[in-house]
């Protein structure tokens, strides 16, 4: 009967930490004119993009303004370096738990460095003239970012769900009531019911596409030497799964980063290059085709980093397994490469479709409720909700099994 108590403790730890992380966003750092700062950042696309993941922390420069963002970026960089540096790749694959701990420690160090860089950039951007205020701001933001990282690790180990994902989920979903409030405040038109119904329909379509992307898989049958030796086991198929969207939200993140870089260059320079860049900015005809190209490109790049057909073929060979009607070796690699490329293209097109719906909703109804969420946010919300629900279901199954025993 210990399992139910353990589950209660997991849920309690998760809820308490999420509450503390949310409260920290609203504790302002002293020495800043927050009203003036909030008015300034409204036109800054990069800050608004980060503000979504900070749950509004950038609008007030609360102590948790950076939140989990430095840890997320550090984790992304480490994952990329693992694929590029053989030592780190060997550390992850061959060293087991010790290697995992070393990689986690590297991620923490990089998080600290990234938090220092981001906090210093914010302090300089605010134009703090006094050294003591600059130091106070950097120390507050960096320390709180490390606390947020610690919170996320506690949730992952002792709570329910993935810690970093839940913190981002909480920050994103907290912006929805404000968007809905802005919508209900402006419902003075005669077509409110029709517009609301159409927006609800768009929302359901987006939700369905998100679930298809998150849960979409390509099943590939695997036949092992053990199965060939036992006729009874031939009926029990071993399945190898390829996800429709291997890159997750990363194609969105990279594509958005490039677009915001273009926007930054356009706003801060004045040359012939700027005039050319302006053709690809939001609200321009070439923006969506360019964004589609970026999403497809980054989907292929990121998928190639996290999923290598050669490694899969080698592992199958080590296990004495193969794909039916496909010879081991080069034919298996070619077969997997073809399937992965097709899935990546389909997944990238689905991702682009998600980006279209909030934009279409905004231009048709002039309502930024969905547009404010963004495609990245919607994908994260659905993905985290599905993963957390699966973990909760697993805990409940274990509880039920123990009670039956």
UniProtKB/Swiss-Prot annotation:
It is a multi-pass membrane protein. One of its GO terms (biological process) is protein targeting. It is found in: Plastid, Chloroplast thylakoid membrane. It comes from the Eukaryota. Keywords: Chloroplast, Membrane, Plastid, Protein transport, Thylakoid, Translocation, Transmembrane, Transmembrane helix, Transport. The keyword Ubl conjugation does not apply. One of its GO terms (cellular component) is chloroplast thylakoid membrane. The keyword Protein biosynthesis does not apply. The chain crosses the membrane at residues 12-32, 61-81, 112-132, 149-169, 193-213, 247-267, 285-307, 345-365, 367-387. Component of the plastid Sec protein translocase complex, which is composed of at least SecY and SecE. PANTHER family: SECY/SEC61-ALPHA FAMILY MEMBER. Belongs to the SecY/SEC61-alpha family. The central subunit of the protein translocation channel SecYE. Consists of two halves formed by TMs 1-5 and 6-10. These two domains form a lateral gate at the front which open onto the bilayer between TMs 2 and 7, and are clamped together by SecE at the back. The channel is closed by both a pore ring composed of hydrophobic SecY resides and a short helix (helix 2A) on the extracellular side of the membrane which forms a plug. This is Protein translocase subunit SecY.
């Amino acid at each position: 009967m210990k399992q139910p108590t353990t589950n209660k403790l997991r849920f309690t730890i998760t809820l308490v930490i999420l509450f503390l992380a949310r409260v920290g966003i609203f504790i302002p750092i002293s020495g800043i004119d927050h009203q003036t700062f909030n008015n300034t950042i409204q036109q800054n696309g990069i800050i608004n993009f980060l503000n979504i993941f900070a749950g509004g922390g950038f609008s007030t420069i609360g102590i948790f303004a950076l939140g989990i963002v430095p840890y997320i970026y550090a984790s992304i960089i480490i994952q990329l370096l693992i694929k590029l540096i053989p030592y780190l790749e060997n550390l992850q694959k061959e060293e087991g738990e010790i290697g995992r701990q070393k990689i986690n420690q590297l991620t923490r160090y990089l998080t600290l460095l990234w938090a220092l860089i981001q906090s210093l950039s914010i302090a300089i951007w605010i134009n703090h003239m006094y050294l003591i205020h600059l130091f106070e701001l950097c120390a507050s933001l960096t320390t709180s970012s490390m606390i947020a990282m610690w919170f996320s690790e506690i949730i992952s180990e002792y709570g329910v769900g993935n810690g970093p994902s839940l913190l981002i989920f909480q920050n994103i979903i907290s912006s929805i009531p404000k968007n809905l409030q802005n919508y209900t405040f402006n419902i003075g038109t005669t077509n409110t019911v029709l517009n609301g119904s159409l927006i609800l329909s768009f929302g359901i379509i987006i939700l369905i596409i998100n679930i298809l992307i998150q849960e979409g898989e390509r099943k590939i049958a695997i036949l092992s030497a053990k199965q060939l030796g036992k006729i009874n086991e031939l009926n029990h198929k071993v399945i190898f799964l390829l996800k429709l969207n291997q890159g997750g939200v990363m194609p969105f993140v990279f594509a958005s980063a490039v677009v915001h870089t273009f926007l930054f260059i356009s706003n801060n320079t004045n040359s012939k290059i700027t005039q050319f860049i302006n053709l690809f900015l939001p609200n321009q005809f070439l923006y969506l085709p360019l964004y589609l190209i970026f999403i497809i490109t980054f989907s292929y790049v990121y998928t190639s980093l996290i999923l290598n057909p050669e490694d899969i073929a080698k592992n199958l060979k080590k296990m004495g397994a193969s794909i039916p009607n496909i010879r081991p070796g080069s034919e298996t690699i070619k077969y997997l490469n073809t399937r992965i490329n097709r899935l990546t293209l389909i997944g990238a097109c689905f991702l682009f479709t998600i980006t279209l719906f909030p934009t279409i909703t905004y231009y048709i109804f002039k309502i930024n409720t969905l547009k404010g969420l963004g495609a990245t946010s919607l994908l994260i919300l659905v993905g985290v909700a599905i993963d957390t629900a699966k973990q909760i279901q697993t805990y409940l199954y274990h509880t039920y099994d123990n009670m039956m025993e």
